[in-house]
Amino acid sequence: MKLFISADIEGCAGVALAYETHKNEAAYGEFAKQMTKEVVAACEAAHEAGADEIVVKDGHGDATNIDPLCMPDYVTLIRGKSGHPYNMMSGLDDSFDGVMYIGYHAPAGNPGFAISHTSTGNSLYIRLNGSCMSEFMLNSYTAASHKVPVLFLSGDSTICGLAREMVPDITTAVTKTGLGASTYCKAPGQVEESIRQGVKKALAGNLSRCSVELPETFTYEAVSYTHL
C-alpha cells in the first residue's frame, strides 16, 4: 500500500497563535517538534496497518519544518518548495492508494479557529462553488483529480467537521477546539494516540469509500484584506 501524507503545523497539538508557527520566533521550535511527532505517529500506524511506502509532504511555510532525522526507513520526506502548482500536494500522482492530512486547520472566513486561513494570511475569505475553501478542500480536489481516496485528517474541530461534510466516511482526529481568540488544546500525547488509532481505522476496509467526486465546474471568489 502506498500513501501520501500532507502535513501542516497550525492544526498540530498546542498551536494557538500565528507567531508560534514562524521560524524566527522562539516558540516555533517546540511546535515543529510536535508536528514531527504527529507525522511519525501517522506513519508508524499506517505501516502497522499495511502501508509499505509512504511519502510525506511538508506543507507549511518554506516546507522545512519536519525533522528528516526522525523519519522511519519506509518514509520519503519531501522538503522545500519546488514551485509545482500542487504546493502542499506536490509529489502526488495516480500511483497512490490514499491521502492523509496532519495538522490541518479551518479556512479563511471561518471563525472556528483563532488562526483560520487559506494558503496565506492575506485573504479575508476564498470561496469555491459558494463554500469557504479550505486547504483541505483544495487539496482533496487535487487528490480527486488522480482518483486517490481521502482517508484521514487531524486538526482543529472545525476543519474536522468540514472534512466530514465533504467526505462523509473520512476518519478524523480532533487536536483542539477554537472559541473566539482562544484555543482549547488536547495534550500532545493524547493527540498522537488519537492519530495512531484514527489512521488504523481509516485503513481498515474498502478505501474507495472515501473517494471525492470532482465538480463539473468551479466558481472561485477571493476577497483580500487590502487592495492589491
Descriptions of predicted regions:
Residues V39-D94:
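Glycine-rich nucleotide/cofactor/substrate-binding loop typically near the N-terminus or early
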Residues A49-V56, G205-T217:
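Flexible, glycine/charged-enriched surface loops at secondary-structure junctions
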Residues M1-L3:
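Extreme N-terminal starter segment of soluble prokaryotic enzymes
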Residues S145-P149, S154-R196:
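Active-site rim beta-loop-alpha module in soluble metabolic enzymes
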Residues S6-C12, G59-H60, I102-A108, S157-T158:
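Short glycine-enriched loops at secondary-structure junctions
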Residues T226-H227:
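Conserved small/polar residues in nucleotide/adenosyl-binding loops
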